[in-house]
A protein has these predicted regions:
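Signature for the C-terminal beta-barrel architecture of outer-membrane proteins
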Residues: 166-171, 187-352, 410, 423-427, ...
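Membrane-embedded beta-strand positions of outer-membrane beta-barrel proteins
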Residues: 85-87, 130, 173-175, 205, ...
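Surface-exposed loop and membrane-interface regions of Gram-negative outer-membrane beta-barrel proteins
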Residues: 58, 95-112, 121-168, 186-189, ...
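N-terminal periplasmic/intermembrane-space "pro-region" immediately following the signal or transit peptide
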Residues: 2-5, 14, 20-106, 123, ...
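Outer-membrane beta-barrel pore domains and translocons
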Residues: 88-92, 133-135, 176-180, 219-221, ...
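Predominantly the C-terminal beta-signal and adjacent terminal strand-loop region
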Residues: 444-477, 481
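Residues on the lipid-exposed face of transmembrane beta-strands in outer-membrane beta-barrel proteins
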Residues: 87, 114-120, 157-162, 203-207, ...
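Extracellular/periplasmic loop regions
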Residues: 36-54, 60-64, 277, 303, ...
């Protein structure tokens, strides 16, 4: 294992630290898994497949079909060394009218995602996870598809992890290429909407007790090519590092509520930052808090953070205020939910000489605002009532009507890539537009699901006066996971 760590580029000190931390541990993790920063696990499955725990299926008596056997393939007679195989096949069709919000022929994307992973466990304390992916795309009016949509084969993840227990503290470290989702979804996400997911390279380490945690990381993004594995490299221009804390709110404070508070301090460096047609080095710091969880029938996800630093010769002074909440209209878990989200992302200075007040998410989940990728939390104010219901245990319907404005009319409207809609910085009307969102998810089984999505973006004056127009987005996809 130490040889493998060195092959992946770990320093000798890291090798020794990870090996030492693996000497004492317990099967059960101390900190609640739902808030440990690895994403949500539902029905045994997680978007990040390494976050799944299939140890129970090492007992053949608990398997219900042949696929279950792939979750624990023993490599030693004792079963201390075993491998968990995982995979996904997703077929998807996107239809977008007026792509890029220009009056132009509709775009159709026929997309294929194939993913295969192997999680090798060496006892309770060491593991190696490897995952490869293929992205295929065809259709019409495609332009030049990004490497996250078209890629013959990519090493999507490859890391080694060691974990253990020191007294009453779980400690661990993960080194290599990995998905990172430890933070608010609108700020950090593996971006499942892509065919090839967003991954980063480097070190993440943690220490956790039953009621608090600390996670530290130093990561660089993967820069994908569109051919084979050899052109998927570590991006030399960008670096993301920081510390996130986590605290479990005592249940007695709010009548048994499951609430968590995560303060964070991050730094993002980019040698080729771009605002207002200017390119230059940028260093941005984030200091904020993420509060989330359930209190009775109410679910909340709130984030406040201040951003500062420099872009070229400009000082950065920006804010994110992100609030999502809903209430369950009944006692059962399947009862309808009614809620709203209200978000503020400051703007201004992208085309000026004063302070740069445009908020910026490191690599957030932009489909939250628009599957057409027409909006991002920079110079943006949104308010959206939301509703979801499950008329049957396997069908989930949801709807939202989102109204959007610019926070600063002297700056542009920005799309998901962070690029501006050219010319919008010269329009002095705040209204961006409205987005109607409808979605249906039919879960035939934990492994198989079918999703349909429709959106209509009704362009407002900020867009139409700069020559942009409205758009419809319609998509359907089927996903099989094992």
């Amino acid at each position: 294992m130490q040889c493998l760590l060195r092959a992946l580029g770990a320093t000798p000190a890291l090798v020794l630290a990870m090996s030492a931390s693996a000497q004492t541990a317990d099967k059960a993790s101390l900190y609640p898994a739902a808030a440990a920063g690895d994403g949500a696990t539902t029905g045994g499955y997680n978007l990040s497949r390494w976050a799944e725990d299939w140890r129970a299926l090492c007992d053949p008596a608990k398997r219900t079909d042949p696929i279950d056997a792939l979750k624990c393939v023993k490599l030693t007679p004792s079963g201390d060394v075993y491998v968990t195989f995982s995979g996904e096949a997703r077929l998807r069709v996107n239809h977008t009218t007026n792509p890029n919000l220009r009056d132009s022929p509709a775009q159709r994307q026929d997309i294929v995602r194939l993913v295969g992973g192997a999680d090798v466990h060496v006892g309770e304390h060491l593991r190696v996870y490897a995952e490869v992916a293929h992205g295929g795309i065809s259709g019409r009016e495609l332009g030049a598809p990004a490497a996250t949509l078209r890629n013959d084969i990519a090493v999507q993840q490859l890391f080694v992890e060691a974990k253990g227990r020191v007294g009453a503290v779980d400690v661990g470290a993960r080194y290599g290429r990995q998905e990172f989702v430890d933070g608010p979804n609108l700020m950090v996400s593996q971006r499942d909407n892509n065919t090839i997911r967003y991954t980063v390279n480097g070190l993440r380490a943690w220490a956790r007790t039953e009621t608090m945690r600390v996670d530290a990381f130093d990561l660089k993004p993967t820069q994908y090519g569109d051919l084979g594995t050899e052109d998927d490299v570590i991006d030399p221009a960008r670096r993301f590092s920081g510390v996130t804390l986590g605290f479990v709110v005592p249940k007695g404070w709010f009548g048994g509520a499951k609430l968590y508070v995560d303060p964070f301090f991050w730094r993002r460096r980019n040698k080729v930052g771009a605002w207002g047609g200017r390119v230059g080095p940028a260093t941005r710091y984030y200091l904020g808090t993420h509060v989330f969880g359930e209190a009775g029938r109410v679910t909340i996800d709130w984030t406040v953070n201040h951003q500062w630093g420099t872009f070229r010769d400009q000082k950065i002074d920006a804010w994110h205020l992100l609030f999502a909440q809903n209430v369950r209209l009944g006692t059962s878990a399947a009862a309808p939910r009614l809620g709203f989200h209200a978000d503020y992302a400051s703007g201004g200075g992208g085309y000026g000489d004063g302070k740069l007040r445009n908020a910026y998410a490191p690599f957030g989940n932009n489909i939250y605002y628009s599957y057409g990728l027409f909006l991002t939390p920079s110079n943006l104010i949104t308010v959206a009532p939301t509703f979801s219901v499950s008329p049957t245990p396997r069908l989930r319907l949801s709807a939202a009507v989102q109204r959007a404005w610019r926070a600063n009319v002297h700056d542009a409207v920005y799309r998901a890539s962070g690029a501006p809609f050219a010319g919008t910085q010269n329009v002095r009307d705040a209204r961006i537009g409205d987005v109607l969102q409808l979605q249906a998810i039919w879960t035939l089984s934990p492994r198989l699901s079918v999703t349909g999505r429709y959106e209509h973006l009704a362009a407002g004056p900020s867009l139409t006066r700069a020559g942009y127009t409205s758009s419809d987005f319609l998509a359907g996809w089927i996903s099989f996971r094992f």
